[in-house]
Amino acid sequence: MIFDEFTLKSQIRAVPDFPKPGVVFRDITPLFQSPRALRMTVDSFVQRYIEADFSHIGAMDARGFLIGSAVAYALNKPLVLFRKQGKLPADVLAEGYQTEYGEAFLEVHADSLCEGDSVLIFDDLIATGGTLLAAASLVRRLGARVFEAAAIIDLPELGGSTRLQDAGISTFSLTAFALDER
């Protein structure tokens, strides 16, 4: 399926003042209610990564799970889940980070990756880059490396992609929104 940025953007709802005043939340749930838009999104990522040399896909809690698991299935790659604190049942590594909303912790099972593994990390969007930087730190602490950070949406004005690139992590997104774009 051919990528159509207009179709993609038309399936992303802008929700002003959520979860707090001044924030425009990018709601991707309409994207998952449109089989055509979802197929186009997954197919676009699959086409980009089908011949890429990485061993695992990482997915960020919670909306990153949606796209990361679909791409992992399509590419036949193991899926590593990065969860919010207290959600994983076995031994974990944890990493603190700042989000656009405040402070939080990210965890991953301690046996999820091995030295030499290479991880493509998915999230729904790149805002400040805090969660993806925390995931990258966890990947490295487990002896693996980050192949790339991928997202459906980039919010470049918040600087996350730049922060990731400054940390040596390449990024890819299907579309970008200005903060005031509706």
UniProtKB/Swiss-Prot annotation:
Function comment: Catalyzes a salvage reaction resulting in the formation of AMP, that is energically less costly than de novo synthesis.
Listed NCBIfam families: apt, PRK02304.1-3, PRK02304.1-5
Compartment list: Cytoplasm
Catalytic activity: AMP + diphosphate = 5-phospho-alpha-D-ribose 1-diphosphate + adenine
Family: Belongs to the purine/pyrimidine phosphoribosyltransferase family.
Gene that encodes the chain: apt
SUPFAM superfamilies listed in its UniProt record: PRTase-like
Entry EC number(s): 2.4.2.7
PROSITE patterns the UniProt entry points to: PUR_PYR_PR_TRANSFER
Molecular function as annotated in GO: adenine phosphoribosyltransferase activity
Pathway this chain belongs to: Purine metabolism; AMP biosynthesis via salvage pathway; AMP from adenine: step 1/1
Keywords assigned: Cytoplasm, Glycosyltransferase, Purine salvage, Transferase
Record-level GO cellular component terms: cytosol
GO biological process: adenine salvage; AMP salvage; purine ribonucleoside salvage
A UniProt-annotated Pfam family: Pribosyltran
The protein's name in its UniProt record: Adenine phosphoribosyltransferase
InterPro entries: Ade_phspho_trans, Adenine_PRTase, PRibTrfase_dom, PRTase-like
